[in-house]
């Protein structure tokens, strides 16, 4: 006889008390995990904060002496900055007041700040002539124009790995003067300095101060300021009108174009050209927005500002050739000139520079720059052909921009090869 045994197991549902205990235990575990993560994040933030030091650059513009009375102050809670070496030529940097830990050797000043910080004082001669006897920095009784790169000289620093600076710039001037810098302007005298790709920040770019005519415009997310001494002859409204139609093409080519752009000019006896700086440029008031050969001096300098490209010895023709090529190409892209006139402009550049070879030079100008622009146009056509239209000179420029290194002739060729996989005929006659 078969006997079937049936076993019934009764599982009792957890009581309300048990459920509450489970919830409390889960919440307790989550709180512990959150506390561990928060403590870890706070520890990291504390460690990062301990690696931040304060740099305060200050200068008073003094029309009577023709100088800027300047200082550099470092504040740190521990020895993050071990030494800073400045290049300070004696003809422009006067009365350097060294501390006990400062060494002066010719034009080199090695500053070894104290553990908690220190201040270095000096005077700076503002007026400066270029080789053609024209001024590229000047101070008068009513205005001053100069580059911050020279007021606060280039420096090499020995800093604890991972340490970064929080940097400010203070500029003082006669009370009736206004001040414009790449970091802001107007009635302000204190500016925050933040230069990308640099852990050791220092003020850079053009500064103008005085009794000024100033125009401002916002275009494509960029705040543009045009400033010049009253009566200088700069047509600021024309400059802004020109940028209203060309700025979109520039920003499309260089999305990292600085959020602030400062364009300055001076008196008629200053250098009759253009000079770029960090987020800023100088342009003589007599320079046309579009020249007779249809290149644009303003777009040429804006290429330098927006791209941030620089070259080492012997490769200046590359940077200047690119700037001249794009001064025409950006006009074409923004419908500033027709394709027919665009082609005619390159024909004129070819005729003008026919007897000029492509040579390594420290400073490309005139016919050498025209030859460089022609080479860039030919290179653009070859890159497009070699890649089936998948790449162009724009691709190359973006690659160079991302590398963030000073160009050499060999590094330029290497970048081209990475895109095309083969040497380009356009560069056959180049260094």
Regions found by a protein language model. Name each.
Residues 51, 58, 63-65, 71-77, ...:
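Extended, low-hydrophobicity, Ser/Thr/Pro/Gly-biased non-transmembrane segments
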Residues 44-75, 403-431:
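Beta/coil-rich, acidic/histidine-enriched accessory regions frequently appended to metallopeptidases
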